[in-house]
Amino acid sequence: VTDHPPGFFQGTEMPTAGWWEALWPDPARVLSAVGLRPGMNVIDLCSGDGWFTLQIAKGAQHVFAIDIDPILLEVARHRLVESGLTNCEFIAGDAYNIARLAGPVDFIFLANAFHGVPDRFRLAKAVGGALKANGLFAIVNWHKRPRDETPILGEPRGPKTELRMSPEETIESVEAGGLKFRKKIDIPPYHYGVIFGL
């Protein structure tokens, strides 16, 4: 029995309060490292509670925060309202429908969710349909390491070991959907980033 909405990606639940902030103390640095630049129109795909959405909105022209979970979107909305930011739309919808929900945009950001996507080919195709001709798609994901080896605040964290993907597996999956690999970076302590274009 699950209380997740239909279409929820496996192993992508938002964490309990505390350790997420400990893992991502400087979201601006992560976003800059994967190619986000001021003035872009951006989709934060599978945006969750808005931890990265807030930082994206500080420099973006406009942000579309898309998530399947309307409750998490309300948390994200509240986070941005408290910060006085008004350049974000919150859209409850399926990631596979991204091109119908928003876009075309300069940048699509997907953090901590690609490992749980059942049909990665379909998602990559959908992302391609929501990007401008020179747009970028950035995935931030957990390294393929045993969960016991990725502790935060003294506890193993992140998706189950068997769900994790190497950068190479991620690149192969996205390229199969028609996007072109541009760059790979390491994001300590436990993540990597891969950037794609059309």
Enumerate the predicted regions with their spans.
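Conserved alpha-helix/loop element of class I SAM-dependent methyltransferases that forms part
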Residues: E21-M40
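Active-site beta-strand termini and strand-to-loop segments that position acidic
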Residues: F196-L198
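A short glycine-rich, Lys/Arg-flanked "PGG" loop and its adjoining helix->strand segment in the class I
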Residues: F121-L136
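Class I SAM-dependent methyltransferase SAM/SAH-binding core
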Residues: I43, D49-N97
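C-terminal alpha-helical "lid/dimerization" subdomain adjacent to the S-adenosyl-L-methionine
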Residues: H4-G7, G11-P15, W19-W20, L136-V194
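A short acidic, Gly/Pro-enriched loop at the edge of an enzyme's catalytic core
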Residues: Y96-F107
